[in-house]
Amino acid sequence: ALIIAVIIRSFFIQPFYIPSSSMEPTLLIGDRLFVTKYSYGYSKHSFPFSPPVINGRVLSNSPQIGDVIVFKTPADNRTDYIKRLIGLPGDNIQFISGDLVVNNINILKSRVSKNDVIYCGKQTIKVNTFTEQLPNGKTHNTVYLKDYSFQNSDIFTVPEKHYFFLGDNRDC
């Protein structure tokens, strides 16, 4: 039974628990979900303890902008991150007056008529909810602090063989 469980978890589906508010309002603290393991192929990180049995990825499909993806970083092989894919290799990402800009295209953002309160660490914060539409047409909800500061950033170019992710909760 243990071997079957390891095979299922390594190759097919894996359960995850949402520990933080970074993906609110899409995923809430305490949510539990199953993630398919085969969507983007397999790498050494697909297996328990990340043994170096595979170099690179096999049976891989390319992720699409807007996909919610579970991943590990090269610097931290133990922590699973769950974020939304915003930029592909070579894309330019920037925030201008609080608006997300990808490859010089302002990401369309429309206000959802409700006001929300979400958890940020151990405190609750008031947020405005928006629906964003990415350049490929995918839509999702995001939240920003109710009195957000209209942040600006430098242009970031996504390096080759890398991706750019953001949580749907943009200010916490």
Task: Annotate each language-model stretch with its function.
Residues A1-F11:
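Hydrophobic membrane-insertion alpha-helices, especially the h-region
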Residues I13-D31:
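Alpha-helical transmembrane signal-anchor/signal-peptide segments
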Residues P25-C172:
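Soluble "head" domains of membrane/secretory-pathway proteins
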